[in-house]
Amino acid sequence: MTARRLAAGIAILGAVLAVWLARPARFVVDGLSMAPGLMPGDLVSTGWLPAADRLHGPARFERWLVTAPDGTRAVKRIGGLPSEAVSIRDGDLVVGGTTVLKGPSVLAGVAVPLAAAVDPPRGHAMLPADEILDDVAFAREVNRTLETVRDAGLVARLVTGTAAAGLRATVGGATIRWRLPAAAAVRLIAGRLDGRLVAVAWRDHAARAADDLRSGLPARVPEAWSVATEWPVGPGEADQPPCSIAIAVAGDARIERAAGWRDVHLRPAADGVASWQLDANSWLVLGDFPTGSIDSRRWGPLPTAAFRCRIGRP
């Protein structure tokens, strides 16, 4: 074989390998385990490098297409990484004794929308419920005992006039204030999440409000919280939901739209197991709708070989 033919053969082999690496995987969602972000019948795609995904490996809170122990395929979210001590406590994910904080983009994929009371003339919006339960409109027929959710908040779009204005967000005993620029649209997310007081506000450059995700949160959010303070922020709040959640504007501004949200409320396994010590080749995967998901709480941790490809954000 001449050097030219060898080079041509290597080039062809490389092209075939590139096509194989770039094959997008498509999967039709079956079931409610990843609701509300993914609903039955949704078609999800991994993009163009699923094999490269496997080489890179999963990261916490990413959604992956996995092979279950019975050989079926399912989409799940990464909860625990190899060699970690992982547990579920009060509905939250705890790793090494510390509650893991979700970023805004993860919250946008897992949150469940709630109704908010909005008073545009007064520039005020609030989450009126004294108790928030892990109920969902998309699975009312699922027979389960509801539990109290401690993590909830508000999302809003505010519009200012020709003058700068002020914004105040109140969560439990804490108040966060922002100065709003003139002639601007501003998005806000604020509430209690994973044992923290969280908030982020950013300028929305769209001419009009973009469609939100099924969670009720914007499809595009910042990567990190601008406020992430340990809870409790006031006396007597350690074990109680932040029942008082409100936002208010002052000056030349109005609340264009507002809604409530609650976080996913994790539950232990059916047999009561709520903690796992992962070995060097094990991962804990969970569903976004815990009472409708079969995941590591039943299967146990999954080996690295079970992960097929990453599902797009959030």
Residue ranges and their predicted role:
Residues 1-314:
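Extended hydrophobic leader/signal-anchor segments used for secretion and membrane insertion
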